Amino acid sequence: MISTQYLIPTYWHRCSISEQLTLLTRPINKHNNSIHLDVKYILDHVSKLGDNALIKFNLQFDYVNTISLKISPNKIINSGNSLSKPIKKAIHSAIDNITRFHTAQYFPKVDLEIIPGVRCKQIIRPLHTIGLYVPGGSTPLPSTVMMLGIPAKIAQCKRIILCSPPPIPNIILYTAQLCGIEEIYQVGGAQAIAAMGFGTESIPRVDKIFGPGNIWVTEAKRQIHYITNKVAIDMLAGPSEILIIADKTANPIFIAADLLSQAEHGPDSHIILITPDMNLAQQTRQELYKQIQNLDRIDIIHQSLTHARIIITDNIMECFQISNDYAPEHLLIQTQNPENYLKYITNAGSIFLGHWSPESAGDYASGTNHVLPTYGHATTTSALGVADFQKRILVQELTQHGLLQLSSTIQTLTKIEKLKAHEYSVIHRINYIKGTT
């Protein structure tokens, strides 16, 4: 039974500013010097020894003696043979939905005549070589393959490689194949990030690394980005978060289930319910006690609930003010007419509107991406999408007439900034046009 000292509803306006800040403080991110040094050791070895270091670390950390790091095409092709029809059907359905939503994200071309003789364009080019990291662990994560692989394929990246700890389950290989990924390597952890960041005899150096992972993977991404100054990363993943805003129309059974769906991710998961209805808060609290008894990861959930919060506000609008300050990874709005509140939301990774929109839908099959900013980064960072696998290149073309039109503006501004060479790059052309060179 979960301790009754947890999840005690707190009235927001009865708290001091300091207490309010504490209520919204996330669990401390477990980053310490020991992890930094461990990861640095791994990165140094992979940088110097290449594939030999990867084979060594596979044996050391995953207890697998890998003769070949690359998964053979034949194994990928046959990976679906051991999967049941319902599993294949679910994967296909999710891929269809995710593909449809992400295809709609494709950047439109911009081609505009600003003034006569001055044309500006924005052209889109895919990243050439990208690396996808899919964590291992006690259960396979085919959804991560989809969330990374589908937008990469839509963006038309030229070379997509995937790394995952050995032995890689068939369901991961099958899902990757359906997402158009053919280059798969059995290597995990910080060493996989190092391989993609530096390149080895087997694994190419990539332009950008995508994918979640544990604290060692996250630290490896941080260090690789800093060391190479060339390899980009998608984002630094933190513990999972959910914030639910609910009114009296909400169902406490649904709320409890949604909160627990995030609590089971890990002991550092942060779950918050904000409501103006104390009765709903108490009902949800009791429902949490009931539902947790039927779940598998009870110890993890218990740890997560030690820093869970139920906040009582004076009105529904105050809920959104608090949520914007917190900037949650997942924001669920379980109220009457939830779409009316969208205009008040400024900070959130992904929003789930209404009583029939569980967070699990976005995690797997609604079509949106589940790679989202955490730890308050939703104030400045967006969910993963097709744009993250592309770059925008700007083009401008001026005719003689166009340059004559702009010349006085350019020269005036270059004089203000005292950049004479800039000014003369225009003057020489104007003189040529006027025949005075």
Swiss-Prot record:
Keywords, comma-separated and alphabetical: Amino-acid biosynthesis, Histidine biosynthesis, Metal-binding, NAD, Oxidoreductase, Zinc
An example Gene Ontology molecular-function term: NAD binding
Residues at which substrate binds: S240, Q262, H265, H330, D363, E417, H422
UniProt: Zn(2+) binding residues: Q262, H265, D363, H422
Listed Pfam families: Histidinol_dh
Entry cofactors: Zn(2+)
Sequence positions that bind NAD(+): Y133, Q191, N214
EC number of this enzyme: 1.1.1.23
Entry annotation: catalytic residues: E329, H330
Classification via PROSITE patterns: HISOL_DEHYDROGENASE
Highest taxon of the lineage: Bacteria
Enzyme class: oxidoreductase
Cofactor comment text: Binds 1 zinc ion per subunit.
Substrates-to-products reaction catalysed: L-histidinol + 2 NAD(+) + H2O = L-histidine + 2 NADH + 3 H(+)
GO cellular component, one term: cytosol
GO biological process per UniProt: L-histidine biosynthetic process
Pathway(s) it belongs to: Amino-acid biosynthesis; L-histidine biosynthesis; L-histidine from 5-phospho-alpha-D-ribose 1-diphosphate: step 9/9
NCBIfam families recorded: hisD
Subunit note: Homodimer.
Record's function text: Catalyzes the sequential NAD-dependent oxidations of L-histidinol to L-histidinaldehyde and then to L-histidine.
Family: Belongs to the histidinol dehydrogenase family.
Protein name per its UniProtKB record: Histidinol dehydrogenase
The species this protein was found in: Blochmanniella floridana
Organism lineage: Bacteria, Pseudomonadati, Pseudomonadota, Gammaproteobacteria, Enterobacterales
